[in-house]
């Protein structure tokens, strides 16, 4: 009798995290990183959303397909405007708990010294 082996492969929509960051106003490069964890681990990234601390959408930004958002270069005296919530949207083709293929996670950026 030949033994039978079963291989199971589970799929899971990603859970997404974005770390909070504090930057000094004179830092020229300001980046945020989207970290999805799911199976399969091949992700599509969508536009980032920048929201005020009150949840109002300020702008949408392209972050590329590596999950890293580099904030646009602006004059030092205007960098305080980069403070707020940043929402990453990504997916791996698997439908999540609430029926969505795209999942979101967010973190906050604070710009000090202006």
Please tell me what each predicted stretch does:
Residues 28-36:
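A short beta-strand segment in extracellular, disulfide-stabilized domains
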Residues 1-10, 87-114:
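Extracellular/luminal immunoglobulin-like beta-sandwich modules
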Residues 49-74:
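Surface-exposed, flexible coil segments in extracellular/virion-facing regions
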Residues 1, 25-29, 41-43, 74-89:
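Solvent-exposed loop/turn motifs of extracellular immunoglobulin-like beta-sandwich domains
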Residues 38-49:
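Solvent-exposed loop segments of extracellular immunoglobulin-like
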């Amino acid at each position: 009798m030949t033994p039978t082996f079963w291989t199971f492969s589970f799929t899971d929509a990603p859970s997404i995290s974005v770390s909070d960051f504090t930057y000094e106003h004179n830092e020229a490069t300001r980046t945020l990183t989207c970290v999805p964890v799911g199976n399969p681990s091949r992700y599509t990234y969508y536009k980032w959303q920048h929201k005020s601390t009150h949840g109002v959408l300020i702008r949408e930004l392209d972050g590329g397909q590596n999950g890293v958002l580099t904030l646009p270069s602006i004059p030092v005296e205007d960098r305080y405007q980069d403070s707020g919530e940043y929402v990453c949207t990504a997916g791996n083709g698997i439908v999540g708990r609430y029926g969505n293929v795209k999942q979101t996670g967010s973190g906050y950026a604070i710009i000090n010294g202006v």
